[in-house]
């Protein structure tokens, strides 16, 4: 199985990284897609998902590490660009449409579909001081507001499970209710 991170939001060819596959048609980044959906309605997500599925299937990419279901609750986090923003209802709508659209069916992955990995469970956008969890000072996801984990961060992951996403990627940070 050939896998990749999403390719439709990055038209830059990087030698040794994505040059062999060529450039895929460019769409706006994930925040741009979310903004367009907010302004034009969710049908755009269906078109986006169908384009991804067809393009990836045509070149033999059958597994995508995409998309981030993280609610951006700390704007200092350097990965905010990969989120659909901070609105849990919009993020949930995006994931609910992307998963079956890319995989090819409401029932899971079809032969023409591309298996998706939704990331970063249980919600990587709650970064302590915006620090990156690849380093010791960024090891915590802090859900300080009572109920924020369930209200803001988990709904899109629940939708991913309901829509039969092929997998969910856990985050490499530790969940906490208080700052370290």
Feature-to-residue mapping (PLM):
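Glycoside hydrolase catalytic-domain context in secreted enzymes
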Residues: 1-180
């Amino acid at each position: 199985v050939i896998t990749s991170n999403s390719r439709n939001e990055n038209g830059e060819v990087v030698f040794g990284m994505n040059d062999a596959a060529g450039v895929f048609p460019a769409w706006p980044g994930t925040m741009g897609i979310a903004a367009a959906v907010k302004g034009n309605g969710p049908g755009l997500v269906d078109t986006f998902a169908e384009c991804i599925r067809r393009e990836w299937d045509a070149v033999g990419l059958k597994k995508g590490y995409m998309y981030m279901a993280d609610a951006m609750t700390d704007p200092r986090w350097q990965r905010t660009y990969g989120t659909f923003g901070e609105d849990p209802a919009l993020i949930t709508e995006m994931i609910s449409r992307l998963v079956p659209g890319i995989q090819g069916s409401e029932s899971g992955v079809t032969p023409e579909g591309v298996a998706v990995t939704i990331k970063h469970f249980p919600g990587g956008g709650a970064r302590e001081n915006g620090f990156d969890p690849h380093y010791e000072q960024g090891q915590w996801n802090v859900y300080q507001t009572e109920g924020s984990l369930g209200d803001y961060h988990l709904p899109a992951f629940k939708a991913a499970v309901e829509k039969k996403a092929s997998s969910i990627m856990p985050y490499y940070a530790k969940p906490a209710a208080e700052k370290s």
